[in-house]
Amino acid sequence: MGRFSNIITSNKWDEKQNNIGEQSMQELPEDQIEHEMEAIDPSNKTTPYSIDEKQYNTKKKHGSLQGGAIADVNSITNSLTRLQVVSHETDINEDEEEAHYEDKHVKRALKQRHIGMIALGGTIGTGLFVGISTPLSNAGPVGSLIAYIFMGTIVYFVTQSLGEMATFIPVTSSITVFSKRFLSPAFGVSNGYMYWFNWAITYAVEVSVIGQVIEYWTDKVPLAAWIAIFWVIITLMNFFPVKVYGEFEFWVASVKVLAIMGYLIYALIIVCGGSHQGPIGFRYWRNPGAWGPGIISSDKSEGRFLGWVSSLINAAFTYQGTELVGITAGEAANPRKTVPRAINKVVFRIVLFYIMSLFFIGLLVPYNDSRLSASSAVIASSPFVISIQNAGTYALPDIFNAVVLITVVSAANSNVYVGSRVLYSLARTGNAPKQFGYVTRQGVPYLGVVCTAALGLLAFLVVNNNANTAFNWLINISTLAGLCAWLFISLAHIRFMQALKHRGISRDDLPFKAKLMPYGAYYAAFFVTVIIFIQGFQAFCPFKVSEFFTSYISLILLAVVFIGCQIYYKCRFIWKLEDIDIDSDRREIEAIIWEDDEPKNLWEKFWAAVA
């Protein structure tokens, strides 16, 4: 999709190289030697013609450095060995090793339509099609709707923050990289491991649901068998090149989008009287009511409030993955163009897919429907399917349940993809074993895939009589880890904006400027922090060790890793503004000329508008 533009093209550089090559450096006066070296030393970052070693290796690999310039630089370096002139690296073996390591990158093979559709529907899965049953039964249609709207505002600002940073510095697993650069190494490493833990656990959740969705049709095959089969299939899928992942997610996400849009039209018809039930309208908001029974407390108002608070946790789990575009930025072609487009569609995704879907579900399914709170299994079927069954539309429930199955498989596939890229990023920055930075010829971090998939085997926990309890444990652990990532995104963006101001850089000059900032970042950081600490309130009513452990285990692990990093790195709690790095990786992207990928026909224009 692009090519490296020639960084060293100045005639002044070539002329200086040739002059020095013609004259022996020993014959030059000492002051002239110092002057010449200051002008041409590649390690001197103050000269406009200098390049760092990473760029040099890249240029050397692509053959875009002029042969004479390379020879002259080597000649000068060798002739001045006695003067002990030190560059970034002078050891030939280390240079060759670095050049070899530079080849081991993930590939920028995701196009605009891939990024857009992944951001639009890539991680829509269990949280939406299955997980909304719990908040609906606890908080009722109105309570759950308010919870999802409130959480949606937080997610919007989080993605805006991430979009501004990821467009300016598009790197793989930018969520963890930004925490390390703009906050401190301890924040970055702890956030990285927790974010990986989040997606690995979410993979277990998704795989555990697949078999139970299939049980809608038959229960003759053991649940454990379905879990094993799809665990193997999804894990193997992640060994294909990222382009295959992009194509798969593009078409599956397209099915999700079309299915949800079709459901919304269908639901509107049923609400208006298009079934044997007659016009439904707000019938179920009047009886059994707009607010659910609540939880824990016998006091109606208090119980409903607690039910609403618990719905926030389910909403957070449902929205997880909206920030996925920040992970794909490092594998996106022309990220300065593709990432902003995807970010700007987040609000459309929140309103259409989540808010509108929950609104119609609340109209068509009463909160006291027994199928919403089945205790023998996590789900008997999706609330979407229940609403279709209530309308008496034959065959359509089976079709939509098949859509749910495809959706959950897609979401599970994205879980492994994200987790493997997080481990890859940690390895590339020296914060994980270097083996996790190894990739196949197609750019797949295979050890990251294996490690992430291994934790997905926790899905077998649901194969017992306490399946519902195990399922909720996995959701709580995953959700809290995801909330911590959102918090770090907001905090990193706050420091990023402060660093820009410190350098005198206007945000108006950025490739993408987040809306309503910095207020949106402070808003998201504050409420995410509150939710992190109150989300486990049920463990205290009364106090239960097992529930406390599952509610706060992610927070405990985060604290342990953070403190360990502080001790190991002996770093400041947070970087000084003048020490914040906003240049690394950015210059490399700016040196690339991307091909124009504008839509050329009606079909491409349609997908550009949708994705």
Curated annotation (Swiss-Prot):
Residues 137-141, 206-223, 275-303, 366-398, 465-473, 533-547 are extracellular. Belongs to the amino acid-polyamine-organocation (APC) superfamily. YAT (TC 2.A.3.10) family. This is Lysine-specific permease. High-affinity permease for lysine. The chain crosses the membrane at residues 116-136, 142-162, 186-205, 224-243, 257-274, 304-321, 345-365, 399-418, 446-464, 474-494, 514-532, 548-566. The keyword Phosphoprotein applies. Residues 1-115, 163-185, 244-256, 322-344, 419-445, 495-513, 567-611 are cytoplasmic. GO terms for cellular component: eisosome; membrane; mitochondrion. The modification Phosphothreonine is found at T77, T90. The modification Phosphoserine is found at S64, S75, S79, S87. It is found in: Membrane. There is a cross-link at K54 (Glycyl lysine isopeptide (Lys-Gly) (interchain with G-Cter in ubiquitin)). One of its GO terms (molecular function) is amino acid transmembrane transporter activity. The lineage of its organism: Eukaryota, Fungi, Dikarya, Ascomycota, Saccharomycotina. The keyword Transmembrane helix applies. GO terms for biological process: amino acid transmembrane transport; basic amino acid transport. It is a multi-pass membrane protein. InterPro entries: AA-permease/SLC12A_dom, Amino_acid_permease_CS, Amino_acid_permease_fungi, APC_YAT. Present with 2580 molecules/cell in log phase SD medium. Keywords: Amino-acid transport, Isopeptide bond, Membrane, Phosphoprotein, Transmembrane, Transmembrane helix, Transport, Ubl conjugation.
